[in-house]
């Protein structure tokens, strides 16, 4: 009873606010505490003049930095200060001040942690301007950056002013490439809006980039069968559209599950060549939607069934592939380069590939043998102009090394597989230019 009375007396003293020398707490300048969002710095006399932020309604945290009213994020979520704390798979986020996170680049002990929204909590944030809020998640023995289960405020809302609905127009680009680098050009999704980045899921939840692909309709991506032959289950893969950098968010990108994975029934691989190397992926978001058109997401036209680009036609190839086969990592940035089609007669010569090249394949190379598709570009697009429109002429399939003289890249000839595409998509794709 005495202990209880003593506790009650102390509590009464702490919460009272008398005048003069009996004052328990007082407001100080905000600079002493770093209070945000209208919080007031309060000094508690009976607790060794400890200063704390007194937060207004809807805010909490050491500096009033947490907005409890926020249930969605604006833009890319850089300013999001809500309380979402799980990734898209439902895994809990690690606290920003946990020992393992303190070893990462972004953590609660950074000098700019308050400005970035990082602190003694595990709420999702976007300190580095990725596509959406994220957090570190423990998967097995490692920590991974994972996007968070928090809603985009713009989803489901009508724009304040009416605007014309965007529609898919195959082969249309928003931008032209600009920055030259060795072996090609750094590009972005707005310049290659049909490019699909295909990732493979691993045990434990991590994902790694696998192959490229091309969006040929809102629900369908075409790629190469050899990318999936060792792991043919659709659940193993995630597809991103509108992505300009590997393992990093690009504003406007979309993530998809694979609803169907269709590998060519007659696919075969010899010592080097891949035959019938084509695959289809039917894609859906977690909400069951297909792709939506934007500046960074667009379909590529399919070729006429009986017409291909002529030899020496200048075409584009795109991907995150390696500069050299011996490179340890893929390119961090999406790249494109130009190659020219090599005639069938030339590519079948003995010092090229001989009889390994069939009429269902195309060859293309840089005339100076300096740029080429390489490992990691598999499944990606070879885009040529046919009848004045950018058209998916080939799919990156195989070749010997990268940019090796007399060994051009070999591509699946898309025009030879239009009936197969039509059969498996059940006529969902318009095959007429």
Curated annotation (Swiss-Prot):
Region (Binds urokinase plasminogen activator surface receptor): 36-59
Reactions that this protein is recorded to catalyse: Specific cleavage of Arg-|-Val bond in plasminogen to form plasmin
Subcellular location: Secreted
Keyword Oxidoreductase recorded: no
First and last residue of the signal peptide: 1-20
Location of the Kringle domain: 72-153
Active site, renumbered: 226, 277, 378
UniProt EC number: 3.4.21.73
A GO BP annotation: regulation of cell adhesion mediated by integrin
Induction conditions: By retinoic acid.
GO molecular function: serine-type endopeptidase activity
Xref: InterPro entries: EGF-like_dom, Kringle, Kringle-like, Kringle_CS, Kringle_sf, Peptidase_S1_PA, Peptidase_S1_PA_chymotrypsin, Peptidase_S1A
GO cellular component, one term: protein complex involved in cell-matrix adhesion
One Pfam family in the UniProt entry: Trypsin
EGF-like domain location: 29-65
Predominant location category: secreted
Keyword list, A-Z: Disulfide bond, EGF-like domain, Hydrolase, Kringle, Phosphoprotein, Plasminogen activation, Protease, Secreted, Serine protease, Signal, Zymogen
Modification sites for Phosphoserine: 160
Annotated region described as Connecting peptide, given as residue ranges: 154-180
Family: Belongs to the peptidase S1 family.
Subunit structure: Found in high and low molecular mass forms. Each consists of two chains, A and B. The high molecular mass form contains a long chain A which is cleaved to yield a short chain A. Forms heterodimer with SERPINA5. Binds LRP1B; binding is followed by internalization and degradation. Interacts with MRC2. Interacts with PLAUR. In complex with SERPINE1, interacts with PLAUR/uPAR. Interacts with SORL1 and LRP1, either alone or in complex with SERPINE1; these interactions are abolished in the presence of LRPAP1/RAP. The ternary complex composed of PLAUR-PLAU-PAI1 also interacts with SORLA.
Name of the protein described by the UniProt record: Urokinase-type plasminogen activator
Organism, as annotated: Bos taurus (Bovine)
């Amino acid at each position: 009873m005495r202990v209880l009375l003593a506790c009650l007396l102390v509590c009464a003293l702490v919460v009272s606010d008398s005048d003069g020398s009996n004052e328990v707490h007082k407001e100080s300048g905000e600079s002493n505490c770093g209070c945000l969002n209208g919080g007031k710095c309060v000094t508690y006399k009976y607790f060794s003049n400890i200063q704390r932020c007194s937060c207004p309604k809807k805010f909490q945290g050491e500096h009033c930095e947490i907005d409890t009213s926020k249930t969605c994020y604006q833009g890319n979520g850089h300013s999001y200060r809500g309380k979402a704390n799980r990734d898209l798979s439902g895994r809990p986020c690690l606290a920003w001040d946990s020992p393992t996170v303190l070893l990462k680049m972004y953590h609660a002990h950074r000098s700019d942690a308050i400005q970035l929204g990082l602190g003694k909590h595990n709420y999702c944030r976007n300190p580095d301007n990725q596509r959406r809020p994220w957090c570190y998640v423990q998967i097995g023995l490692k920590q991974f950056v994972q996007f968070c289960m928090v809603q985009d405020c713009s989803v489901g809302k009508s724009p304040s002013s009416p605007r014309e609905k965007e529609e898919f127009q195959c082969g249309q680009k928003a931008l032209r490439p600009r920055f030259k680098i060795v072996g090609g050009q750094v590009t972005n999704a707005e310049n290659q809006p049909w490019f699909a980045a295909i990732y493979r899921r691993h045990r434990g939840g991590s994902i790694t980039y696998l192959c490229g692909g091309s969006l040929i309709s809102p629900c369908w991506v075409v790629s190469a069968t050899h990318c999936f032959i060792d792991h043919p289950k659709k659940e193993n893969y995630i597809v991103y559209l509108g992505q300009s950098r590997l393992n990093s968010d690009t504003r406007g990108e979309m993530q998809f599950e694979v609803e169907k994975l269709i590998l060519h029934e007659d696919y075969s691989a010899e010592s080097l060549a891949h035959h019938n190397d084509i695959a289809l992926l039917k894609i859906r978001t977690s909400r069951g939607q297909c792709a939506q058109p934007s500046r960074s997401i667009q379909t590529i036209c399919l070729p006429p069934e009986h017409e291909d680009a002529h030899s020496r036609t200048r075409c584009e190839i795109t991907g995150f592939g390696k500069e050299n086969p011996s490179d340890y990592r893929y390119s961090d940035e999406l790249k494109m380069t130009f190659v020219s089609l090599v005639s069938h007669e030339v590519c079948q010569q003995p010092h090229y590939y001989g009889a390994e090249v069939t009429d269902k394949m195309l060859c293309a190379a840089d005339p100076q043998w300096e740029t080429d598709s390489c490992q990691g570009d598999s499944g990606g697009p070879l885009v040529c102009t046919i009848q004045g429109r950018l058209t998916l002429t080939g799919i990156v399939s195989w070749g010997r090394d990268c940019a090796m003289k007399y060994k051009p890249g070999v591509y699946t000839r898309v025009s030879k597989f239009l009936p197969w595409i039509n059969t498996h998509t059940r006529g969902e794709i318009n095959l007429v230019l």
